[in-house]
């Protein structure tokens, strides 16, 4: 069997930074260290940090006053920040810097009274945090997921609009929705191209590059990982059978009946150790040749807060 490993795959700079923030806080301060929401959407990573003394909560009312709390890579609303300050919580912010860029755009629109449209998935913590940057009743913030949502959208002033996107969506994910917005609202302002999350786009490009060369695609990532699900969907759109697995235990040998070529990748929140375990499990099924497929080099590094260095 030929096993192709897509590149780049796995941890991005934002995930590396978020995990490092929790690890350094655990080293420098006595547990418990509270983390609002899963710091990244991966079961293995979260369990590892729990075992070391991190306590994951969904709301700040689960955190004792004057405790240390870390905001997840997905970001939080302004209301959450205000509550943390009011209660005297010591905050370390693990929000991905690329998410923060989107937050600043929404906050700027709010200050200017420009209505803002967010392209994203309802219920995702990043979406909730981004929409929570807007607090100007003179304008408004709207969430759309599809061209149909755009068709049904009603705004106050069609000539005073901007849009932003959830960072775990690539340009390809949002093309149709953006086209619908620009068709309906010709004067709408969008983000600059350099605001696109490089990691999301690179991992999707890597899947696209490999998908047509294999009969089966395995994506390593947790079910609540938005970007991992997008990778699986992209492989399927290319006509390749694809499965999302948390770890090697999820790999079903029946998937490989008659398969000669399989590809493996990992979402941005999945560690390489899980990829290795999955590849090892596949290689045990038949004599295998493992090939690293060349891809775009990533050298972005995001620094942790100065107090944790």
Curated annotation (Swiss-Prot):
Positions of isopentenyl diphosphate binding: 41, 74, 124, 225-227, 269
The EC code for this enzyme is 1.17.7.4
Q: Does the keyword Glycoprotein apply?
A: no
Enzyme type, top EC level: oxidoreductase
Where does this protein hold (2E)-4-hydroxy-3-methylbut-2-enyl diphosphate?
41, 74, 124, 167, 225-227, 269
Source organism superkingdom: Bacteria
Question: What keywords appear on the UniProt entry?
Answer: 4Fe-4S, Iron, Iron-sulfur, Isoprene biosynthesis, Metal-binding, Oxidoreductase
- The active site is formed by 126 (proton donor)
What pathway, per the record?
A: Isoprenoid biosynthesis; dimethylallyl diphosphate biosynthesis; dimethylallyl diphosphate from (2E)-4-hydroxy-3-methylbutenyl diphosphate: step 1/1; Isoprenoid biosynthesis; isopentenyl diphosphate biosynthesis via DXP pathway; isopentenyl diphosphate from 1-deoxy-D-xylulose 5-phosphate: step 6/6
Residues that bind dimethylallyl diphosphate: 41, 74, 124, 225-227, 269
Please provide, alphabetically and separated by semicolons, the GO molecular function terms listed in this UniProt record.
4 iron, 4 sulfur cluster binding; 4-hydroxy-3-methylbut-2-enyl diphosphate reductase activity; metal ion binding
Q: What name does the UniProt record give this protein?
A: 4-hydroxy-3-methylbut-2-enyl diphosphate reductase
Q: Origin organism of this chain? A: Shewanella halifaxensis (strain HAW-EB4)
